Amino acid sequence: MIANFREIGGLPVDGNRVVKKGIFYRSAMLDRATDEELNELKKLGIKLAYDFRDKKECRGEAPYEKIGAEHRNIPATYKNDKLFKLEKGGSFAMLFYKITWRDVAPTYEHLPIGNQAYRALMKSVVEGEVPMMLHCTAGKDRAGIGISLILLLLGASYETVIEEYMRSTSVQPFIESVIGERIPKIFHPYAFRHFHPFFTVYKELLDTSLNKIISTYGDYGTYFEKEFGITAEVRKELIERYTEEA
């Protein structure tokens, strides 16, 4: 099974409506997918795969042709100075540093504002380039924010957005296996204990993104119009297009 894979079809939005099924998907990276898994993915008819990883993260085989999807790799990354220093410190940094979700919060604060990746994503949503899939490495942070923005655009409640985001707690074993292959085994206990925010999701982190949107723009409608050029009229049309009566 492809890690952290799911769709948001069926989730409730305003007006006693739900997101239509078979349109918006999310997952972790596809590099480790088996041929059988890729064949199942191909059956979904996904036209576009947004890959929010940095170039250096794209180490494995790119299987997008096998699923019949166009691959758009647009990094959705913010350079968090503290985390950048830890990365440069290599494996030995794990012995001396311990991070909390608060150390990751600056990344979440900056991601939804002025981000070229999400601007491209919203343009695709408006232009109807669906079905689409969003992914990064674990499919929990950058892809998580992308899916959250789509849900907010379509009128999902705060509770629905948070609940969907928190489903990514299930991806922890996958992340541990990926990181475990990239660092010496002797450092595994330190990595898993000292860098826990890299392995799971925190409600407080998505709250950081949502609070930044509201503090900057006042409401989501203004955010979508100012950041992405999606007016109230266009948003209404998108809700009609991508949702249906429950």
Language-model-derived ranges and their functions:
Residues 1-133, 146-246:
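Cys-dependent protein tyrosine phosphatase-like superfamily
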